[in-house]
């Protein structure tokens, strides 16, 4: 192989790696946003004092675990 061919192959590998990385990152953004929204909702319940009310604590034990 000549130097031009090796350089071209190297550029092709770098380009392919960049494209794969970029598309997989964009695909995961939806999952990250959903997880962030759920965490925000749980934090809002905790901040509003849900864990101090027994009825609310029964419905959201995963938020109020160990709190009395």
UniProtKB/Swiss-Prot annotation:
Keyword Signal in record: yes
Question: What's in the keyword line of the UniProt record?
Answer: Acetylcholine receptor inhibiting toxin, Amidation, Disulfide bond, Ion channel impairing toxin, Neurotoxin, Postsynaptic neurotoxin, Secreted, Signal, Toxin
- Where is the PTM Tyrosine amide found along the chain? 65
Superkingdom, according to UniProt?
A: Eukaryota
Localisation:
Secreted
Instruction: Report the GO molecular function annotations.
Output: acetylcholine receptor inhibitor activity; ion channel regulator activity; toxin activity
Which residues are assigned to the propeptide feature?
A: 22-48
Q: What does this protein do?
A: Alpha-conotoxins act on postsynaptic membranes, they bind to the nicotinic acetylcholine receptors (nAChR) and thus inhibit them.
Name the family the entry cites: Belongs to the conotoxin A superfamily.
Name the UniProt record assigns to this protein: Alpha-conotoxin-like Mr1.3
């Amino acid at each position: 192989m000549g130097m031009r061919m090796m350089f071209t192959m190297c550029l092709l590998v770098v380009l392919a790696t960049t494209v794969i990385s970029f598309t997989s990152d964009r695909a995961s953004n939806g999952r990250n946003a959903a997880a962030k929204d759920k965490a925000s909702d749980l934090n809002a319940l905790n901040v509003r004092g849900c864990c101090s009310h027994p009825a609310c604590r029964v419905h959201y034990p995963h938020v109020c675990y160990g709190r009395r």
